[in-house]
């Protein structure tokens, strides 16, 4: 971002953050580049806070926002499903970016709510990253280790079209409130 913008940005709502950041990146991009032939504008290292986390649905009349798709995608993530068949009822986007036509590599829910293969095989077949978040916050309310890993090393090698842009979700329990930091 430009030097005057190098601070923590604060917004009351998700919509306010979304609209302001879209305007900033299009009107004053820090970088313009073309990964995989797609021209993009970008800022690196943007940090912002949404003060009213309950007001988290984007309301931007100019944008084609489908509440049915939003609900469907949320349920898909929460179910731990990464099959494109189910979510494609709401949008063909997922089948179009799938590397194998049937699996969405970037379906966060599968990575968060399903048992991790390597850990399940060696330690605990019920262990999930979400279970770890809950257990760790209960056992150590001051923990800084409560991290969900979304992107894995295999994504860099195996996935070609569908790679998660989110790297980690980190949770903190402070003053009886859960705070989340997302690294993308």
Q: Residue ranges of each PLM-predicted region?
A:
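Terminal, non-catalytic protein-protein interaction segments that mediate quaternary/complex assembly
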Residues: 1-184
């Amino acid at each position: 971002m430009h030097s005057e913008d190098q601070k923590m940005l604060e917004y009351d709502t998700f919509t306010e953050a979304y609209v302001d950041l879209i305007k900033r990146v299009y009107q004053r991009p820090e970088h313009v580049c073309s990964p995989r032939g797609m021209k993009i504008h970008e800022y690196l290292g943007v940090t912002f806070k949404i003060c009213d986390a309950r007001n988290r649905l984007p309301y931007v009349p100019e944008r084609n926002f489908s509440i049915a798709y939003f609900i469907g995608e949320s349920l898909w993530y929460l179910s731990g499903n990464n099959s494109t068949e189910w979510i494609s009822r709401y949008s063909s986007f997922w089948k179009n970016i799938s590397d194998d036509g049937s699996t969405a590599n970037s379906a966060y829910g599968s990575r968060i709510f399903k048992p991790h293969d390597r850990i399940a095989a060696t330690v605990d077949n019920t262990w999930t990253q979400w279970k770890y978040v809950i257990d760790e916050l209960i056992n150590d309310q001051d923990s800084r280790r409560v991290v969900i890993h979304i992107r894995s090393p295999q994504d860099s090698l195996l996935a070609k079209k569908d790679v998660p842009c989110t790297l980690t979700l980190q949770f903190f329990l402070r003053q009886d409130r859960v705070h989340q930091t997302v690294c993308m």
